[in-house]
Curated annotation (Swiss-Prot):
NCBIfam families: hypD (TIGR00075). Pfam families: HypD (PF01924). The keyword Iron applies. Fe cation binds at C36, C64, C67. Keywords: Iron, Metal-binding. One of its GO terms (molecular function) is iron ion binding. This is Hydrogenase expression/formation protein HupD.
Length: 379
């Protein structure tokens, strides 16, 4: 199958891994962070860490949109869903994320809240048309990839004159969060050292490669945009190793079959028409990050659920035993959490990192435990 099988070829993967092992200096460390939930999943699924030399270490960043949602915003969504006049709809993974007191949208639905799962924002628009006596609120989440579809339905709602449709906007921005990662307390203290970034795939198809230029310029941190297949990731890792060996810090694009420098101009223009950048936004694990999220422009304010329902900011209560915030910062791994595997599992998630398949904990639970057990048996 074109563009799938050829990027999963085992012989080529072994050749790339051998090249990385040959070129990686065993006397130094290569600490590389992926910033995409799809990459996290692929890294575990295809056993990429098992192919790398000990000097190349992969660190998982805040690339899972479900995982980075702060509990306070989820509390606000649950408050909305419990209003008798509201139907709240969102993507499936968000239904299971624990909020304050381990309440989730799924539990709120079991207690009679009108919560619907959808696959596309267009379904929310149709729901509003079919239920004129209800207030339909789309709980919008995600990075730049999922933002244009939300912008499109807001424009469509305005053209249709829909009075019972609004959006609770929680779209976040990748480059701002990457800046924040390099400014975390662990990074400043030197306990979290990052030598390079694996740039996100889907996000980069929208924003292009140009927005990553500040990372080599300001921080001396190289970045290579990679696709999702195992050969994509291995080639990107080899490119990062070569940059670091040569003392270079550049933005390189391994995923040339889908990513350009300028990105998707139409998608970016659509987003720009409907949204503007917030002054600040709270991220799980990172705290308040300046200019890291979007809000609905004044021209579309009638579709802003925060304004329509006069929602007040909430401070959520984190599970103190859950290490998800530190895992999202790259400061800890899933194995460092005492809840991991028991009692926290995909069937009983105590933190957001265990909910989505793109979360580091869920990916490690699905694929990493078996490899760890095999390593321990081999010892």
């Amino acid at each position: 199958m074109k563009y799938v099988d050829e990027f999963r070829d085992g012989a080529t993967a072994r050749q790339l891994a051998a090249r990385i092992a040959a070129e990686a200096d065993p006397a130094r460390q290569y600490r590389l962070m992926e910033f995409c939930g799809g990459h996290t999943h692929a890294i575990f699924r295809y056993g990429i860490p098992d192919l790398l030399p000990a000097s190349v270490r992969l660190i998982h960043g805040p690339g899972c949109p479900v995982c980075v949602m702060p509990i306070g915003r989820l509390d606000m969504a649950i408050e909305l869903a419990r209003r008798p006049e509201v139907i709240l709809c969102t993507y499936g993974d968000m239904l299971r994320v624990p909020a304050s007191g381990r309440v989730s949208l799924l539990k709120a639905r079991a207690e009679s809240a009108a919560v619907r799962m959808l696959y596309s924002p267009a379904e929310a628009l149709k729901l509003a048309q079919d239920n004129p006596s209800k207030e339909v609120v789309f709980f919008a989440i995600g990075f730049e990839t999922t933002t244009p579809p939300t912008a499109l339905v807001i424009e469509q709602a305005q053209r249709l004159g829909l009075k019972n449709f609004s959006v609770f906007c929680n779209h976040v921005l990748t480059p701002a969060a990457m800046h924040a990662i390099l400014a975390t307390p662990e990074a400043r203290a030197g306990t979290l050292q990052l030598d390079g970034f694996i740039g996100p795939a889907h996000v980069s198809t929208v924003i292009g490669s140009a927005p990553y230029a500040p990372f080599p310029q300001q921080y001396g941190t190289p970045l290579v945009i990679a696709g999702f297949e195992p050969l994509d990731l291995l080639q990107a890792l080899l490119m990062l190793v070569r940059q670091l060996n040569e003392g270079r810090a550049e933005v390189e694009n391994q995923f040339t079959r889908a990513v350009t420098a300028e990105g998707n101009r139409k998608a970016k223009a659509l987003t720009e028409r409907v949204f503007e950048v917030r002054e600040s936004f709270e991220w799980r694990g990172l705290g308040a990050v300046p200019h890291s999220a979007l809000q609905i422009r004044e021209a579309f304010a009638e579709f802003n659920a925060e304004r329509r329902f006069a929602l007040e900011p909430r401070t959520g209560l984190e599970n103190k035993a859950c290490e998800c915030p530190a895992i999202l910062r790259g400061a800890k791994s899933p194995r460092d959490c005492k809840l991991f595997g028991n009692p926290c599992t995909p069937d009983n998630p105590l933190g957001s990192c265990m909910v989505s398949s793109e979360g580091a904990c869920a990916a490690w639970y699905a694929y990493g435990r078996q490899r760890q057990a095999a390593v321990e048996v081999a010892r």
